[in-house]
Every structure is written in structure tokens, then in C-alpha cells.
């Protein structure tokens, strides 16, 4: 009973650590910006100084910098936690066993699933925002703050496509899912990690599609027996959303809307089919 309770609270601990680390890095960053602004400030009123400081700590560059630093630190810390306490080092499946089973099929499956889910998530957000219109401005403000609605800078791409997915996979599909899996059936553990993954984004509209995507990631991590497939899928999904610009939006009329929606459903289905086929060949 004690071991069960220990695993239950441990499955929530990574999310708490992520939140605390984000806050800590933000405050440290704000402190350094304040010191820099105070050191370089020469003239003007206090309100001018405060306005300049406020503009700096709410800027896209500051937000992206904080996310990049926290994700890099969390990825290193959680890697050692996962490797030392959770990872099954005696597992027969290698880190990229699912990919090696049939590389071409796996790569095509990842690409199809990434593109398909990007479109589906976009349409899902549009539908949800019709029922909850107040959620859309919150989401747009969040995306503006993270620089995802403007030009794609190198730090932003590095965080969104590389460091962020590694950090989040170690946190949710690595630690959270693994601890939950010790005391719960797969479906329950998958729902728990997906809910925490959605909650981490702290935006109701984004939480809707990140929950759905989290379920898919958890499913393939379970299939692969390790984090490699989750990381690959997460990187690919984010890369499509960030690097393709407006590609994941679509539909100027009902017919085009339907065709793109249907095509995204087919792409998602084929992607899942190909990756499942690879998993069976690996077994």
C-alpha cells in the first residue's frame, strides 16, 4: 500500500517540479533584467524606468529565453531521474527499436500523423472557440508572448522543436506515465499523464488539443516500450506547426474545408496504421 501511494504522488511530482522551475527561472530572469536596467538607466522619471523594465520582462525575447533555459535545465535533471529511477535498463527493446523495425514505414507514419494531427487540432480549436469565445483571445495572447505568431527566431525554433519536446516527454511520458503505470492500467495512466500535460500549458483552448495529442503520444510510448517514439512524434508535430507557418490552417469555403478535414483524418489514420504495423513487426 505504501509503495502504491508513493508511486501515485511521484507521478504528480514532475509537474510540480516543472511549475516551480518555471517560476524560479522567471524570477531570476526578472531580477537580472532589473539589475541591468538599473545599471544602464541614466535619466527620466521612475515611471519611465518601470515602463522600460515592464516592456523588457513581457517581451517575446524574454519569454522565449526563460522557456529555453527552464526546458534545458529540466531536460537534464529529468533525464538523470528517468535513467536512474524509472528506465528499464534490462528491456529487450532498444531506444529506436520501433524506428529500426522498418525505417521507411516509420518515418512516413510519423510525418503523416504529425501533419494530420496538426490539421485536426487546428479544426478542433476552431470548433471549441465557437462555444467558448473568451478562450481565443487568451490563446492568441499566449502565442504572441511566446513569439509563435510572428517571425520564427532560432531560440524559438530550438525550444519548440528540440528542447521543449525532450523536456515534456521526459516529464509526462517518461516520469509521470511510468510511475502511474506501476499502479494503474494503461488507459488510466495515459489519461492522467495527458491531463497533466494539457494542464501544464495553462490555457484552456490549448489544453483541449494537447490532451488529445498527449493520449496519442502515451499510446505510442507504450507500444514502443520507451520514450524514443514519443520524442520523435512530438518534435515532428511541433516542427510542422512552427516551420510551416499557415500551412496547418485551411479552408476558404465549405468544400475546401471538408476536403482538408477529411484529408487530415485519413493522414492521421494512415500514420497510426503504419506505426502500429511497425510495432507488430518489432514484437
What function would you assign to each model-found segment?
Residues 1-107, 115, 239-283:
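N-terminal, membrane-interfacial amphipathic/helix-forming hydrophobic leader that caps
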Residues 5, 9, 13, 104-108, ...:
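Alpha-helical membrane-protein architecture signal
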Residues 23, 27, 115, 119-123, ...:
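Transmembrane alpha-helix boundary/anchor motif
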Residues 23, 27, 31, 194, ...:
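Functionally important transmembrane alpha-helices
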Residues 27-35, 123-131, 170, 179:
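Membrane-spanning helices that line or support transport/gating and their immediate boundary helices
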Residues 42-46, 51-57, 89-164, 182:
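Juxtamembrane helix-loop-helix connectors linking adjacent transmembrane helices
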Residues 163, 174-184, 199-205, 228-231:
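Short, amphipathic, aromatic/basic-enriched membrane-interface segments that mark the entry/exit
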Residues 167-192, 219-226:
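Membrane-interface helix/loop boundary segments of multi-pass membrane proteins
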Amino acid at each position: 500500500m505504501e509503495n502504491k501511494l508513493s508511486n501515485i504522488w511521484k507521478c504528480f511530482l514532475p509537474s510540480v517540479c516543472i511549475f516551480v522551475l518555471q517560476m524560479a527561472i522567471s524570477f531570476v530572469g526578472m531580477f537580472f533584467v532589473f539589475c541591468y536596467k538599473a545599471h544602464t538607466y541614466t535619466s527620466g522619471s521612475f515611471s519611465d524606468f518601470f515602463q522600460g523594465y515592464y516592456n523588457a520582462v513581457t517581451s517575446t525575447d524574454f519569454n522565449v529565453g526563460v522557456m529555453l533555459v527552464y526546458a534545458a535545465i529540466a531536460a537534464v535533471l529529468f533525464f538523470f531521474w528517468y535513467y536512474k529511477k524509472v528506465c528499464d535498463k534490462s528491456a529487450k527493446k532498444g531506444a529506436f527499436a520501433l524506428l529500426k523495425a522498418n525505417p521507411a514505414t516509420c518515418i512516413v507514419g510519423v510525418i503523416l500523423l504529425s501533419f494530420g494531427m496538426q490539421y485536426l487540432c487546428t479544426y478542433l480549436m476552431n470548433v471549441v472557440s465557437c462555444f467558448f469565445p473568451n478562450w481565443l483571445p487568451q490563446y492568441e495572447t499566449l502565442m504572441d508572448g511566446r513569439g509563435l505568431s510572428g517571425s520564427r527566431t532560432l531560440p524559438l525554433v530550438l525550444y519548440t522543436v528540440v528542447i521543449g519536446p525532450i523536456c515534456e516527454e521526459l516529464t509526462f511520458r517518461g516520469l509521470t506515465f511510468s510511475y502511474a503505470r506501476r499502479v494503474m492500467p494503461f488507459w488510466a495512466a495515459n489519461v492522467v499523464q495527458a491531463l497533466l500535460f494539457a494542464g501544464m500549458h495553462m490555457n484552456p483552448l490549448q489544453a483541449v488539443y494537447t490532451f488529445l495529442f498527449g493520449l496519442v503520444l502515451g499510446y505510442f510510448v507504450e507500444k514502443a516500450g520507451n520514450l524514443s517514439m514519443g520524442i520523435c512524434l512530438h518534435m515532428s508535430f511541433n516542427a510542422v506547426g512552427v516551420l510551416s507557418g499557415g500551412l496547418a490552417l485551411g479552408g476558404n469555403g465549405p468544400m475546401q474545408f471538408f476536403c482538408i478535414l477529411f484529408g487530415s483524418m485519413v493522414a492521421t489514420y494512415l500514420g497510426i496504421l503504419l506505426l502500429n504495423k511497425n510495432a507488430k513487426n518489432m514484437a
